[in-house]
């Protein structure tokens, strides 16, 4: 089957070193050939639907405006199986429940617009995903797992066209992902990644390959289950958005996939249904196979 701790000063230094490497080695060619997307002053929807970078290039009255990076949602879920073995050191593990509240918060901030031309931005993002045992009042409703995912990246808004598709986003950066736990439940990895997003009519396709760097002692076989890339597909059907994303290791046959459906109920809130099946829904479950179904609300979909 398609199977926090706070960031240390050492990790911050590593992030800076990686950025210094990324700029001259891989990003300047993109700056040289990408078509310019002029920074615009706007106060409404993004100029390019689904483009994270085009959205971040827009200027607002408030200089501290935060932008959505990934989706932001809250859903009530039920899983086919709970990974109690991974959390056996928690004193409440035997009483852990299969129903949980799952939510994701994902925001980005432009650090330097126009760093390599008007179509470029140096940005930072933070994504947090949590699994909350809200109904487990017997154990004081603990958080079973939380994943913290900061990124530092350089992005370009482009307008390249090929066979009906338009390449909208080119992004390269550094990603740290951890659950902020100490041993034996600590899970973390660091990656260099590239994200490419293209659109064609009502379709959106995004591919995000990565290269693992640094130590993975907490989870040495994580790529066996999480692979080396993520693929995301979206389709706009009227006001509804259908989405699918997943990762897969073709050598091992392990991976995981997430399906989503959202529909607006107000101007700012969407009804959201999500199904995840396979390995790697969270870091603590990277090598655990399950199917989880959830229903709730969403603030922003992929486009």
What is the predicted function of each stretch?
Residues 37-116, 133-136:
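Solvent-exposed N-terminal domain segments of exported/luminal and surface proteins
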Residues 80-90, 97-98, 112-235, 246, ...:
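Outer-membrane pore/translocation modules
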